[in-house]
């Protein structure tokens, strides 16, 4: 369901003039000559690069230019590339390395802490500062030249069960920081911080603290915003996906739809006020979230130029919304999903009561890891395809009343799953092609380029180059499990592909021409 806050959303009549192409480029932040300066590459979340030096015709010729071993856990972060420096993270660690040679410029190690060390998404860079979130829910500002700490502020109380893996989103003078925490019954929060001082500017609650008058979440907590959002400067709206409600599997303890959990919310970055919200899964009892990336596209839909936001959600459904208002335009499954009986008038799947967690277990698809997850999709404007790492999987969900109404409040067990990269037609939701990625769930996101290439990883530890038009394999390399989204950058006239495999970063490029 979409809820619109009166007077806040820009009408479609005020939208910018669209170009004559079917899908237009939403120019929101400059991808400085070949750099990758934000988590998604730009504000749209499309993860589409304009670089064209590496093509379908020559990608088989790329060779390893450099590698960098972190010595820590699996890299799940998107590297940031700015001013010839690569910034990459792991829990408690930030590295600055030379983008030409992988020479380490500095390394920051956060003090030992009792936070939850599940992974890390990356940093934000602003002027001469690098911003990093910590496992115990702090935000640290580092000097971009030296790695020295400028300031350190608390975003949320780790003793209550909050942590952060979030790559902050910088919107003008607002640094938006999300947290996680669904082992406890905690309200979902997104905090805006002054990047100069660390002072809190505002806090948005997806589920208000218990006891809040007129609480729209129907007594649920949760709805954490742990993934990096997207931004439309023309509407001045930030789009963020929210997580699951808590207690996670105990639905009877939180009757109702549980707004704004499992939702896409549109917020004013200057005030934190909600413009509208769309709930992808009402009353979620399977830990599916809707934290996945809200991708912004300016395109023709149903014959009309429209400002769109689309999401391949963890519940196995693909959504296309009008981002002026949050009105649903399309809802289609993109992965195996047996938990709904249909789609309601607001574009939301209708839950099947027979698939609710039960004492004797219920076989449900997707499983707890979802039809997709944190791994980012990519939108290719030339083909109009959203490339999504999909997971077809079943799990058995249990609910036991004696587990109570706190935290997880039940159990679930994955049974079987396979992965595929699926190319979704944004106008119909149809799968135009798919490329099998193997047994289990892939941890790799997706990158597309203007030359017609798609990069991702499979479950066997290979990074892949595919032809975007049909999914044909053009190149691959075994590097260990890929847990992040590939990026690309250009430096000194040379295009690089940068991917994390295991605990190392690998950069490929075409052979240098003889001088």
Named regions from a protein language model:
Residues 31-70, 103-112, 148-157, 199-207, ...:
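Aromatic (tryptophan-biased) beta-strands that constitute blades/sheets of beta-rich domains
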Residues 295-335, 359-367, 502, 510:
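Phosphate/diphosphate-binding loops
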Residues 391, 415-468:
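Loop/turn-rich, solvent-exposed surfaces of beta-rich toroidal or solenoidal domains
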Residues 188-198, 257-271, 419-425:
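Beta-propeller blade signature
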Residues 12-25:
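Bacterial N-terminal signal peptides
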Residues 98, 143, 194, 268, ...:
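Structural recognition of the beta-propeller blade-terminating site
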Residues 36-40, 72-93, 115-139, 163-187, ...:
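Repeat-blade elements of multi-bladed beta-propeller folds
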């Amino acid at each position: 369901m979409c809820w619109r806050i009166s007077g806040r959303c820009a009408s479609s009549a005020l939208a910018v003039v669209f170009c004559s192409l079917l899908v237009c480029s939403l120019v929101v932040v400059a991808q400085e000559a070949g750099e990758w300066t934000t988590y998604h590459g730009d504000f749209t979340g499309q993860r589409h690069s304009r670089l064209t030096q590496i093509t379908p015709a020559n990608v088989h010729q790329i060779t390893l230019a450099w590698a960098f071993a972190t010595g820590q856990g699996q890299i799940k972060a998107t590297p940031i590339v700015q001013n010839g420096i690569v910034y990459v993270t792991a829990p408690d660690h930030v590295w600055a390395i030379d983008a030409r040679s992988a020479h380490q410029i500095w390394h920051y190690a956060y003090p030992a802490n009792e936070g939850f060390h599940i992974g890390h998404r990356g940093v934000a860079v602003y002027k001469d500062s690098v911003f990093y979130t910590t496992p115990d829910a702090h935000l640290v500002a580092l000097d971009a030249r030296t790695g020295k700490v400028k300031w350190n502020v608390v975003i949320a109380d780790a003793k209550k069960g909050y942590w952060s893996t979030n790559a902050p989103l910088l919107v003008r003078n607002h640094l938006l920081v999300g947290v996680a925490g669904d082992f406890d019954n905690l309200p979902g929060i997104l905090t805006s911080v002054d990047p100069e001082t660390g002072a809190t500017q505002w806090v948005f609650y997806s589920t208000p603290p218990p006891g809040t008058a007129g609480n729209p979440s129907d007594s649920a907590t949760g709805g954490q915003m742990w993934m990096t959002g997207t931004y439309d400067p023309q509407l001045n709206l930030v789009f963020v996906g929210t997580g699951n409600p808590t207690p996670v599997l105990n639905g009877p303890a939180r009757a109702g739809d549980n707004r704004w959990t499992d939702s896409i919310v549109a917020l004013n970055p200057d005030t934190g006020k909600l413009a509208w919200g769309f709930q992808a899964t009402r009353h979620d009892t399977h830990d599916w979230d809707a934290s996945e990336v809200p991708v912004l596209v300016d395109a023709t839909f149903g014959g009309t130029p429209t400002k769109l936001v689309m999401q391949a959600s963890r519940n196995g459904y693909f959504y296309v919304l009008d981002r002026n208002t949050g009105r649903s335009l399309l809802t289609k499954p993109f992965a195996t999903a047996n938990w709904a009986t249909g789609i309601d008038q607001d574009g939301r799947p209708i839950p099947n009561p027979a698939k609710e967690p039960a004492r004797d277990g219920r076989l449900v698809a997707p499983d707890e890891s979802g039809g997709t997850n944190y791994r980012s999709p990519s939108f290719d404007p030339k083909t109009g395809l959203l490339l999504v790492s999909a997971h077809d999987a079943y799990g058995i969900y249990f609910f036991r009343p004696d587990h109570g109404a706190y935290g997880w409040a039940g159990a679930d067990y994955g049974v079987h799953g396979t992965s595929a990269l699926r190319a979704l037609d944004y106008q119909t939701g149809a799968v135009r092609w798919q490329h099998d990625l193997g047994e289990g769930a892939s941890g790799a996101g997706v990158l597309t380029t203007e030359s017609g290439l798609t990069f991702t990883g499979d479950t066997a530890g290979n990074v892949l180059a595919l032809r975007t038009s049909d999914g044909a394999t053009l190149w691959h390399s075994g590097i260990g499990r890929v847990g992040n989204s590939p990026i690309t950058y250009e430096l000194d006239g040379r295009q690089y592909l940068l991917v994390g495999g295991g605990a190392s970063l690998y950069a490929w490029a075409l052979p240098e021409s003889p001088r």
